[in-house]
Structures are given as C-alpha cells and as structure tokens.
Amino acid sequence: MSQSASGIVNIETSSGGAVDSFADKLSGISADFRRWDVRRVEALLDLPFSDLIHRAQLVHRQYHDPNGVQLSTLISVKTGGCPEDCGYCPQAARYHTNVENQDMLTVEDVIAAAAAAKAQGATRFCMGAAWRGPKERDMKSVVEMVRAVKALGLEACTTLGMLKPGQAEQLQEAGLDYYNHNLDTSPEFYGEIITTRDYEDRLDTLQKVRHAGINVCCGGIVGMGESRRARAGLIAQLANLDPYPESVPINHLVQVEGTPLHGTEALDPLEFVRTIAAARITMPKAMVRLSAGRREMPDAVQALCFLAGANSIFYGDKLLTTGNPEAERDKALFDRLGLHSI
C-alpha cells in the first residue's frame, strides 16, 4: 500500500490475507489506526451478514453508547444554480429539476432555523451552499452564521464546497466545529459521477480543514450504480485519511427526476447496512451518520443500521432540497428501539 502526494491511497494489496482470523478480528477492535486496503474492506463486506453485524456491534459498544444517537439538522443557505455536474445533485444548474434557485439566506433566517432545530432536540446545525466554493464576499455572511449558531449553544457545521487558502482559518476563528466535504465514492468510480472537479480537489480541501484545526465530516453516497468493490474503495479511502474523519455521513442515493442518476437500479437495503457496518469497524471512534435516503427506508432497515453502528442522523423534514422523515416518525422509531438523543 502506498500514498500519492495528492493523498489518494493505493490500496489494492493486503499483507494479512482476505480476512483476519477471528482472534485478530477481536484484537483489532481496539486498534484505532489500522491501515485498511480495498481487499480487507471488501472481505468485511463479504462476511456472512450476522458475522459482520456482530463484529460492528462489538466495535460500536467499545467506543460509543450503543443506544445514543446524535440529532443534527441540515439546511440550505444558498440553493440551486451550482456549476458542478455531480450526477446525483438536483441543484446543478445544467439539470432540469424542480429545484428553484434561492439567494443566500440572511443571518436572521439562519438563527430562526437553528433555534427551531434546537427546540426539536438537535445538537448540531449544518449549513450547506450550492456553489463550487465560497467567494470572499460570501465568507462574511457565512462567518456571521457560524457565530450565531454557536451563540445558541449548538455545534456548527458547514458544507461549502472547495475552500481557498485562508478560508478554513476564517471559519475556525468563527468557532466552526465541523466542515463537511464528502469523497462521494471510490477514486475508480468517481469519474462516472463527477467531471467538474477531481478527487485531488476534494482531498486538498480536507487538508485545508485539518490544517486549520477544524473537525472533518467526510463520507459518501452509495446506490449510484457502483460495485461492492467501489463501496469498499470508498470506505478504505475514508479510513486511511490521517486521521480518519470525526464524522462519517453515509448517504443512500435519493433519485431525483432530471438528474443523470435518476432511474439507477436500486441498491439492496442490506448492502447499505453492510456499508454502515464496514464504516463502523474501520473508523471505530467516528460518528457514523445515517444520512440522505432515510425517508425511503423502512424502519426495520434503519434499525439494522443503528445495530450496525450508525449513531447520528439528520433530523427534520428536509435535507437541503430532498425530503427527510418527519420528526414525529423519528421520535416514534426512537421510542420503539429504546434510543435516546446525545
């Protein structure tokens, strides 16, 4: 295994064979910074379902409250008109979707939304903007939003695209807790989904965030037509970031009419659960977030995801421009499963 100057890890070989012995599996639970290659992650995904979930649950219980789930709320502070060509995204200007462009929200709008989220039990408030990256004129408003969210006693997170030099430091000085910038998929499958920015661009922004002292929120999307090996490649890339992200959102593709990925063959729900389990095993201390796609998931599938190690969700009826389960449905599910918010 080797790593390029750009940060993409060459993770095709394994020194330990396809699957470690059972004793190695157990001893490996406490090894926070093991190196994971694609073959080892794929071997995890290939395990019998009960064995995989059992292993993930052991890891989860060692590092986390098994019945605690963080509630986060995500809003769009600038909607539509994005110049990128991400094949899953209804906010791309080149696709004909029902998303209406919206200028930047005011700080007052964000304060009202954050206060409502806190009243509903959210502890983290995330703000997303549809653009390639923030211009300097945008940063003043974003910094004010971050400070306002922090003043309410919430964790603040932003997802603003690619950052220029110095912008991460501005966000850190404002008190930003987390910056989200997903890898989306494996390096090998990436070109099938996005062509307007490359993998190295994403890694460069993550490096800027780390150097500024901000926690990293980084995950991906599954169900985009990728192979199991590509899912293993995504997890391996995330797990081999140094250090791995503090927060790992695993999104299920939400198919939106008008985007290139609309009509993609649906992913087996158990394959999604397997991906959650692999994320938990390979990144034991991270918060693994069950993210987009929950509205379409049966409660039983979500329950399996929590069993597999998910311990964070987006809470509220909307994620940027796509739907999310209603708060009352989530509360009822938590009651049925004996879960509590953290």
Swiss-Prot record:
Pathway per its UniProt entry is: Cofactor biosynthesis; biotin biosynthesis; biotin from 7,8-diaminononanoate: step 2/2
Q: Which residues are [4Fe-4S] cluster-binding?
A: C82, C86, C89
Keywords, comma-separated and alphabetical: 2Fe-2S, 4Fe-4S, Biotin biosynthesis, Iron, Iron-sulfur, Metal-binding, S-adenosyl-L-methionine, Transferase
EC code:
2.8.1.6
Residues in Radical SAM core domain copies: 67-294
* Reaction(s) this enzyme catalyzes, per UniProt: (4R,5S)-dethiobiotin + (sulfur carrier)-SH + 2 reduced [2Fe-2S]-[ferredoxin] + 2 S-adenosyl-L-methionine = (sulfur carrier)-H + biotin + 2 5'-deoxyadenosine + 2 L-methionine + 2 oxidized [2Fe-2S]-[ferredoxin]
InterPro entries tied to this protein: Aldolase_TIM (IPR013785), BATS_dom (IPR010722), Biotin_synth/BioAB (IPR002684), Biotin_synthase (IPR024177), Elp3/MiaA/NifB-like_rSAM (IPR006638), rSAM (IPR007197)
Q: Name one GO biological process term.
A: biotin biosynthetic process
Q: How is the cofactor bound?
A: Binds 1 [4Fe-4S] cluster. The cluster is coordinated with 3 cysteines and an exchangeable S-adenosyl-L-methionine.
Give, as one word, the top-level EC class.
transferase
Which of this chain's residues are annotated to bind [2Fe-2S] cluster? C126, C157, C217, R289
UniProt GO MF annotations: 2 iron, 2 sulfur cluster binding; 4 iron, 4 sulfur cluster binding; biotin synthase activity; iron ion binding
Query: What does the protein in this record do?
Result: Catalyzes the conversion of dethiobiotin (DTB) to biotin by the insertion of a sulfur atom into dethiobiotin via a radical-based mechanism.
* Protein family per UniProt: Belongs to the radical SAM superfamily. Biotin synthase family.
Spell out the subunit comment.
Homodimer.
What protein name is recorded for this chain?
Biotin synthase
Origin organism of this chain?
Answer: Nitrosospira multiformis (strain ATCC 25196 / NCIMB 11849 / C 71)
The gene designation is: bioB
